[in-house]
Amino acid sequence: MLKGENIKGYKILEDFKVAGGMSKISFAEKDGKTYFIKEFLAPKYPTSDSPGSERIKEQKRKACDEFEKHHRDLNNAIGKCCAGTGGNLIYAIDFFRDGTSYYKITEKIDISSFPCESISCLPLEKILLIAKSAVHSIRILHGLKIVHGDLKPDNLPIKEAARGYVVKLIDFDDSYFEGNPPPDRENLVGTPEYYSPEQAAYIMDEDEEIEGATLTCKSDIFTLGIIFSEYFSGEKPILPPDYKNTWTCVNNGGAISFKKKLHPQIDGLIRKMLSLNPNDRPNINEVFNVLKNIKLDEITPSSERMSSDEPKKPSLRFGPGFKPISSKGVSPATKTIAPTPEEISKEKDTEYKPVHSGLRGSGLKIADK
């Protein structure tokens, strides 16, 4: 698709560019308004003149129908909650197939993304505003029992407003309803350096022994813990030399640390978010309550190492055969919209108490540390 061409009433303003290997992106105009447009590189809908036997083409059509239903169901759920454009969630306002390709349309947003290194240099109260705004956006999604699946700073663009900061949430290509990820694991790409242990195990399980029920909103919480490390310290968690990703380190009981000394409540929160067992992680409402109740006058002595720095040997590793023994500990958010300032001021404080469970797994041996 090239500049000047028209598709379903959208005039393409720029040649499409490959983005992330799974899609091409551009901008388009319709009825005098500019939109963001994405073309999916897969799946491709087989037409009557497409190569291959009719049996193979029918299989591909079925896969495309499932892909289309998945995206429409997500878009409808988010759209009903957000009621139009201009909100915190930048979701697809149009989704269609043209020929063999699928396209997604979202509103165009003009937001400059802050590098995490710059965010970490802000006063703590400003970093907290950014973190709470990010949580507000994510809790809308979790209130619908939808897992984002690809949280990262690029998908949480920040806008500086007159009264603070607004963090949007974009790119729901890897999103799914809690416990029901797409069966085609190859299309659940995400961003490996932000994987949770259970997300990595599910995607990398070639024998497909790990059930989708293991993937809940708590997977996003692990990823958000990595992002919070970037917000508050300027970098992802510091890992031992043998590990490349946070999830491999946590999965093998490795110790993590941070680039700089963190406020004790923030340090403790991030460590809980990075728990191996999803049941030991706070839900998104509990994360918000901790951030809301941070006491800025508390100072961590630089010469004192936090007791929580000592790693605990994990009681499980995610691997083939892993099944949650219950749904306890997976506490869905109770709100589906971001709270107003009045609601925030009235919200009852919630003391976070992690739930310890007897989860066990047989261990997925992953070469890439």
Where are these regions (language model features)?
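Activation segment signature within eukaryotic-like protein kinase domains
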Residues: I130-A131
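ATP-binding glycine-rich loop module of kinase domains
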Residues: K24, E29-D73
